Amino acid sequence: MNFGPRPRNNRTIRQYNFALTGDIQTTLDNEKVARSFTLKLFEAEMAANDRVAVLFMPRSERLDSPFNINIAPGRRVTLPRGAEYDFLRYQVNWRTSNRRVVAFDGRYEAGDFYSGTRKEFVNNITFRILPGLFVYTAA
């Protein structure tokens, strides 16, 4: 479900976006394995095609097999089959237009991760050398 109003007579902001999406995964016996929702609390799309958004993402998961997680170099934890976990994650993402000579896109995400927490920062830089010729970097 998406709602995307366009402000009138605004030279800076082209459109606001608000959305709710959901996904439910089941086994062949119709037992729930995972349920996730993404609530886009706010997204602003600028006239120059730049964007910024804030998302809220609750998720529920029941492991159908043991799951190994690396918690540090050389240290692993195995989560048992059948264990159930509820996550609540938040995300801020951004993107500038690829029409720019130097463009940025990325995200910061934080929140629950199985029996702990996780923070993730991703930022990519794109250089437009010539029209149609790009160099992409990722960090």
What residue spans do the PLM features occupy?
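Exposed, low-structure sequence patches enriched in small/polar residues
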Residues: 2-139
